[in-house]
């Protein structure tokens, strides 16, 4: 997918999943996502975000994937890991509420993995590659088709929002930028990335000066 925005904006988007409740209200989100607090941890070369949405209503796509009833509640998880320069891995899923998913028992639900690989093209455009994998109901092709369609639709919504965000930033009237608690993981990732870029540029400058 081609993104009309800086690659860092997409990294921030993937590390701040409370936007699911607003940008993806008809595809991936419920209001409960934005209401729950997330935890994040910064490692030496990664940032990991974890959010549990406990005892929450199940939205349409998860109903189909997990075989849940429309009025059932589920415990949802979102585990997101960023590794430099621009790889974001997601482990997401849901299980029937209060059946032990938070303690590691996912037998009453399902989960899937998502890989996002982002390649800068220019300061204001990027290439977005993604892949999805699952280990449940693997013989049902309609699930693969639904995954592709739903994911592409959701990511297209992201592309639209980020393009508008880039356009707004290009006006030069968006400073100062306001960050909120949900931005914590994204801020840590971008800070780590900026330090790495600065170090790489310094090394290149030193090498050039030595020639």
Placement of each model-derived feature along the sequence:
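C-terminal catalytic domain of Rieske-type non-heme iron oxygenases
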Residues: 1-211
